[in-house]
C-alpha cells in the first residue's frame, strides 16, 4: 500500500513539474510605454467657471448664505448643553472601596483561595488515585 502511494505521489509530482514548465509567465510593467504630451489647449490657470456652476462659499461680511427668518424657524436647532461627566474622572464612592468585612480591599484583584501546601497534597492524592485506577 505504501509503495503504491509513493508511486502515485511521484507520478503526480512529475506531471505537475512538466505542466508548469511549459507555461511562460509574462510580466506587465507598471510604467507606460510612452508618456502622452499635455494638450495644447491646456493652460496653467484653471478656466473660469460659469456663475450657475460655481460653488457659493460664505464670506465673513455677506449675509447671502444666512437663512431667512422663515427658514430658521423650520430648521431645528441643537441645544448647547454640557456633556455628561467622564466616569473615569469622577471621584469613586468611598463606600465601594471597603470590603464587607470592613478592611480595605487588596491592591491586586487575584486572591489565592487554596494554599500551596493544600494544593500539592491534592495533586499527590490525585496522582495516587490515577495510579490505583490504572491497575484495575
From Swiss-Prot:
InterPro entries: AGP25/26. Residues 40-53 have a biased composition (Polar residues). It is a lipid-anchor; GPI-anchor. It is found in: Cell membrane. Residues 109-136 form a propeptide. Residues 59-81 have a biased composition (Low complexity). O-glycosylated on the hydroxyproline residues. Residues 38-95 are annotated as: Disordered. Its main location: membrane. Keywords: Cell membrane, Glycoprotein, GPI-anchor, Lipoprotein, Membrane, Proteoglycan, Signal. The keyword Lipoprotein applies. A lipid is attached at residue 108 (GPI-anchor amidated serine). Residues 1-21 form the signal peptide. GO terms for cellular component: plasma membrane; side of membrane. Belongs to the classical AGP family. Proteoglycan that seems to be implicated in diverse developmental roles such as differentiation, cell-cell recognition, embryogenesis and programmed cell death. This is Classical arabinogalactan protein 26. It comes from Arabidopsis thaliana (Mouse-ear cress).
Amino acid at each position: 500500500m505504501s509503495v503504491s502511494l509513493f508511486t502515485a505521489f511521484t507520478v503526480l509530482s512529475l506531471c505537475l513539474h512538466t505542466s508548469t514548465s511549459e507555461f511562460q509567465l509574462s510580466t506587465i510593467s507598471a510604467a507606460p510605454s510612452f508618456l502622452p504630451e499635455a494638450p495644447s489647449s491646456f493652460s496653467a490657470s484653471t478656466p473660469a467657471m460659469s456663475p450657475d456652476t460655481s460653488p457659493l462659499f460664505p464670506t465673513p461680511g455677506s449675509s447671502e448664505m444666512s437663512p431667512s427668518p422663515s427658514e430658521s424657524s423650520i430648521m431645528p436647532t441643537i441645544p448647547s448643553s454640557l456633556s455628561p461627566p467622564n466616569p473615569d474622572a469622577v471621584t469613586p464612592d468611598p463606600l465601594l472601596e471597603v470590603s464587607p468585612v470592613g478592611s480595605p480591599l487588596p491592591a491586586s484583584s487575584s486572591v489565592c483561595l487554596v494554599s500551596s501546601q493544600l494544593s500539592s497534597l491534592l495533586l499527590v492524592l490525585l496522582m495516587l488515585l490515577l495510579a490505583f485506577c490504572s491497575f484495575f
